[in-house]
Structure formats: structure tokens, C-alpha cells
Amino acid sequence: MGKIQKKHGKGRLDHYYRLAKEKGYRARSSFKIIQINQKYGKFLEKSKVVIDLCAAPGSWCQVASQLCPVNSLIIGCDIVPIKPLPNVITFQSDITTDHCRQQLRQYMKTWKADTVMHDGAPNVGMAWAQDAFTQSELVLQSLKLAVEFLNKGGTFVTKVFRSKDYNNLMWVFQQFFEKVEATKPPSSRNVSAEIFVVCLKFKAPKKIDPRLLDAKYVFEEVSQGNNNNEAKVFNPEVKRRKREGYEEGEYLQHKRLSILDFITDSTPIDNLGETNEMTWTPRSIKEGEVDEEEEKEKDKEARDERGNVQYVLDDKVYSDEDALKMVSKLPQTTPELLECLKDLKVLGRKEFRAILKWRLSARDLLQIDKPEAGVEVEEEELDEDQLIDKELSELGEREKARKKRERRRRNEMKQREIQRMQMNMTTPTELGIEAAKMESLFNLKQAERTGKLSELQKGKRSHVSETGDEHVTLEEAERVDYGSDDEANGLEDELESMYTEYLENKAARTAKSVVQRKKANVETEEWFGISDKKDGDESDGEMSADDVDMATIDDGEDEDDGKTARTLNNGNMFFSNPIFDNLVNAAVAKTEAKPKALDLLEPGAKDLIELEKAKKRKYAKKNGLEYSDSEDEEDDIVMETQKQDDSDIEYVHGESDSDDEPNIDLVTDQAMTMAHQLATGQTNKHKLQDDGYNRYSFRDLDGLPQWFQDDENKHNKLNKPITKEAVEALKQKMKTLNARPIKKVLEAKGRKKMRALRRLEQMKKKSELINEDGARSEKEKADDISKLMRKLAKPQKSKKKTVTVVYAGGKNKGIAGRPRGVTGKYKMVDGTMKKEQRAIRRIKKKMGKK
């Protein structure tokens, strides 16, 4: 017998058909949802609840059961029965009925679906237009169920046929989902009209317009209106193609219109947009156009027996020919206008406007817009209640307008304030106004009320007050009271305290400053001296006005004492640094020889020098040494009277060879340059002394605020030149310092070395025992010693063996034996074991408390 050839209608037995047979899928459409899932972020792997509408024969449910997480809820329904599938709930129902909705709610309880899929299609074969519309209705019903059961951020996948309702469906999808895309997977046949729409990120609106899910409203055919004649007239430069075709019966595509029809018609723009040419011929009434009602409405027009229109002007009757002659004699009827009327399709906006103005003039000439005579409008008088209501409504409207203006003004002010903040324009603009108390602003209305506008126009400089009774001259206006000295001092104190607080907050944030404060251990609180005024009975109570004045006077008297105390405290804090331990003696020795140098010191430094001399004497007496005030007279180091923030020499506090000499280290480019010049002989002691006297050395900063002094010391200082050799030397020094390992690394290396030495000692002892063993030959002894040497050289491995922990879930759930891909020791764990271990620890903790 010959082999039976099976028909391959529409290529059904293609590559995907054979793959579906091999993999056990019920239909080749399984690959469609697989490819869509891979293209759009694998949404099935993240879905706990999946609904498949029109699921027969169940191929999409098969894919969902394989890709969704374990213990996921998968529900499939169709109008035809579906064979049972593992881990899938199936039932038979029509998705357009309430029974399907009730069944879904019964299975899902209070859950929400993460993904809703729809791959249904109606029975086709009758008519293509009817089949496409039925498919669109089916898609809308599936969307209705998806909107009801989908969770926020869910996904909806549906099949749609390409038809005229496609755009309507896409618009509805976009109302419910943030992202809507149409795709055609490779497994879908090219001859098929199906496409798949993937809707991502469901919005879950609280209120849904029922019309969006109504097929009558969504697929309603909207009648196309007239052509956009306004665009043709007012924007004729833009040419639009006629994709909709042409009107029925219009074979020549060249429309002509009588000028009288254009003048009398109420839609002139439509006439200009649809007409090609206007003629000077009388218009004729078509058959069936005239009726009795129209005759009654148009009293100003009359028709003769032939049907031509007759115009009644000033009790005289004119025909179409007469009306055309009257219109042609208008001044606006120019030769240019006549040429424009011959071809309207080539005109621009300017020409169309001229034609419309000419039409209005013609209507006025023919008295078409003239109101009917004898018709008077009677105004009804309003009673008292109506007048009150009208007045109240007007007041309400005015109040609304006022509130609207006020709201607009506030919004504008807020916008300006936001703009000022964005541009960092944070300086208060009202300071000048408050200082002058609004009197420095010139107001033209106030000047007009005072009657002094003429004097201002003549150039007289005077000030106009609000009342007009006071006349302030320029000299008096310039004498402005800016406050007393006490207020200025209070402002300075406030600024000083704010700056001190700023420095404290800034220093508290840096770790270096914390370490410096711990090392220095110096009190930073300033002492402003003791006032002579007696704080007696009213120290705890409130002060009166007289007491405040007296306190202000006392503060002024004690101002010099407070300054002296502050200066003394600052000097003590400055010279308490260990840097001056050796330098004080030099200053004391030079005091007798150079008394002027001692005067350069800050107030309070003299007392500090005497204190240091006493310390030196005590130290010399304790160690049995002789101390002389002129011992350090020839010291090469010169003290600078000006305190600088950025010192070139860093004094390291730590262990040193002598208790009297600090440990000095060179850490800056300028310090290294100075040391290099001293070492090479480029400079000497006397030149350094001369360089110490410069324009920054004799600045008088007494009485100036601290923030100003800090700013001066930061910017106004001597910039000493540096050399390339000094920079390279400093870089090499820092490189050497950075190359040194830290203390912990050195300790670890030392411990490692000690362990190696101990192992070496042990090996020596074992080697001696081996050599002393007479029962062994020399070869055996050499082999044993070699083994010991290799063992010593071999790095020690950790004896702890690794154990692989495998979770007994997912693909390893219920597995017998070793899991796939696991080598070595392993341990199976699951949630129950974790709970048991937690319970054991809890019981031990309770037993320990008892």
C-alpha cells in the first residue's frame, strides 16, 4: 500500500507543531505565551495567581504551571470542557455570563490575580466583518473580568484581530494600564490576522466609568462631521490629502457658487472652504427648496413666479440682477477682489479676510441684517425681592472676583519667593524699609495730596510726609539715628557669640579637632572679668528701666577691663602650647638686651615668661643642674608676635630624647624649603630674622571681632616661595611614611615569624632524635629529615571542612540522595528545621533564666 499523505492546510504541521508534540503541549499556541513572557520581563515567574480565559485545550495553563512559583493558583475556564491538568483548576463557563464571575470569585476568595490571559476567538467562517466584531466584543468582556480581578500592577495579555475596532480597544486599554504594547510572536503564523496586546502595570482605579466596558459605547461609529473648512480658510498654507474620498455625485470636482448665495448664506466659511469659484450669475431655487414656513420666516425676501429671489429695499423691490449691479458698484469691489473670486483654492489668509469684509459690506447694502421694524422689547420691572436677589448676586460676584485677585496675588508672591530661594537671593529686602520706617519711599499720590508736586518739579529737594504738615529738608533727612553705641556693642557681642558657636559646631564634626582637644586639654571658655557693680537684692528678680540704664553705663566703664581680661586669656591659651617650652627662655634672655622685643609680645605673655623661668629653675634644682637666665641668648629660633593659623612646622608630642626639647617634624612645603635652604647655606639666621619683620607683623587687631581676625589670618599672610627640591623631598618622605605598615600588620608578621621559629625548633629536636637513633640507616634518617623539612615549608591548611547547605524546597523538595551539582559534605535544611532550632534556643534561654 502506498503511504497516505496528510494535508498540511495553512502550514499547520510546521516546526512549532512538532515541538509541541515533543514537549507534550496540547497546542502549538504554548510557544506564543512563552515568547511573550520572555519578551516582557518574565511576568509569569512573578505571578502567584493566574487566570486563563478561553483556556481550551489548556496549553497556556500548562505553561503557567511550569513557569509560575510553587503553590501558585492557576484557574482556567472555557465554554467547552477542558481535560484536567496538574496544579490547575478548570471549569466550564461562558466568560460573558455572571456564572463565570461567580465561579472565579468562589475559587479566588479574597485574592487578586497577578496575570490575566485571554486567547479566545469566536467561531469564524460566516463573514469577516462580523467575526472581527465578535472577537472585539470577546476581548472587551475579558478586559471587564481582568479589571475586576487584577491586582494593582498586574498584567493582562489578550489576542486581538486587526480590524477597524482595534484603535478603540487600544484606547480603552490605555485608560487602565500604564504601558500597552502590541506584539506578534514568531510562533504566530504570518497569514493569521491575530496580534497580541500586552498590558503592563494595572492602575487599579477606584472609580471606573461603565461606558469604558460597554461594547455599544466603545465600538460606536461616530459620524464624521463636515470638513474642517475653518482650517482651509484661516490656514490655507497647510495642504491636506483627501484620504476619505469624494462626495457622491461630484464627478467634476469643481464647485461654483453664486455671489448672492455667498452673501445671503449664514455659513460663509464653509462656502469658502468647499467652493472653487464664485460667479456673478443670479441664483436659482432648486425644486423642493421653497416651502410655506420659509416664506413666513423671510419677510424681507420675495420670489417671483420663476423662483428668483426679490429684495425689498426702502419699499422698493429689486431682482437678482439689480442686486448684483449694486454689489458690483461697491467701493470694496476692486479688480483684485474680482480676480480672487475666480479661483478660491489659491488664496491665502489675507485674501480670505478681505472677501469676508467685502461680504459684510454687501449685506449692509442689501439690508439683510437690518432688524425688523416695529418690534419693541419690553423690559419688565423687578419687584423688591428680585432687586435684593440681584444685588446680592452682584455682591457675591464682586467678592468672588476680589478673592480671585487676592489668591492670584498670593500665588505670584509665592512664585517670586520660590524663584528668589532658587537663585540664593536670601537677603531680606525689608531691612532698608524698616530702618527708614517707610518714610524714604516717594509716593506720587501723596505728593499730589500735599500740593507740593510743583516744588518737586522745580527741583527742590524736600521730603513729602503722609500728612503733608511736616516739611523735612535734605540736611534733616540725612541725619538718621542708627542706634546708640550700646546697641552696636550688643550687636557685636551677638555676632561674636554666633561665630563662636559656629566654630564649635565645625570643630565637633572633625575627628582631628577632637584629638587635638584631648591632647591640649585646655579650657576654651573665655573669662570677661568681674564687674564692679554689686549684684545685690535684685540679682534674682527683674531689673527696672533705671537699673538697665545703670548696667549699660557700668558695662561701658568696664569695657577696657573686659578687653584686657580677654586678651590675657587669649595669650595664655596661645602660649600654653608645648611649642613655646624652649622658646620662652630665649625671649626672657633677650628682654634685658632688647627691651623693645618684649613689647612686641601680646599682653599676658610677660607673666607667662616669668612662670616659665620659675619652672626652669625648679627643674634645674631638682636634677642638680645650674640654670642661667642668659643660657639661651644665642638661640637661632626667633619668636613671631603674630599668631598664625597655618604653621609651617608641626610639633609632634610624644617620646623625645630630652624633656626640654620638642619633637619637631617638617610636614609642609614651606618648612621643607626653609630647612633645605639652611642646610645648603642659601640662607642664615640673620636673614630669617629679617624675614620675620614684614607688613603682617605689626597689625593691630585689638578690639576686632574674632571672625574678622580669623579671616585676616587666613588670607593676609606672607606667602613664602617653595622650591622644587623641597617638594620632591617632602613627597619622598611621605611616600616612605606611607610605605611603612601599620602596627597591627607588624604584630601579625611578628607572630607569624615566631610560629615559624617554634616549628623550626621542634624540627631541630626531632632531627636530633632521628640522628641519635642507631637502628635507622643513614638513608632512612635523611628521608625522615626531608619529610620534616617539606612539612615545615608546606603552608598550614585549615582543618575545618566546608559543609554545603541545601534548601529542601523547590527542585530539591522530596529528593532522595545527594542533590544534583553538590560535592563534598552537605546538609539538607528546610523551614521546619529552622523553627525547631529556634524553639530549642528559646527553651534553653528559659531554662537559663530559671
UniProtKB/Swiss-Prot annotation:
Skewed-composition ranges (Polar residues): 273-282
Reaction(s) catalysed (UniProt annotation): a ribonucleotide in rRNA + S-adenosyl-L-methionine = a 2'-O-methylribonucleotide in rRNA + S-adenosyl-L-homocysteine + H(+)
Chief subcellular location: nucleus
Stretch list, region Disordered: 273-305, 388-414, 529-569, 620-646, 811-850
An example Gene Ontology CC term for this record: preribosome, large subunit precursor
EC number from the UniProt entry: 2.1.1.-
Feature: compositional bias, Acidic residues: 537-561, 628-638
Subunit note: Component of the nucleolar and nucleoplasmic pre-60S ribosomal particle.
Family of the protein in this entry: Belongs to the class I-like SAM-binding methyltransferase superfamily. RNA methyltransferase RlmE family. SPB1 subfamily.
Protein's job: Required for proper assembly of pre-ribosomal particles during the biogenesis of the 60S ribosomal subunit.
Official protein name in the record: AdoMet-dependent rRNA methyltransferase SPB1
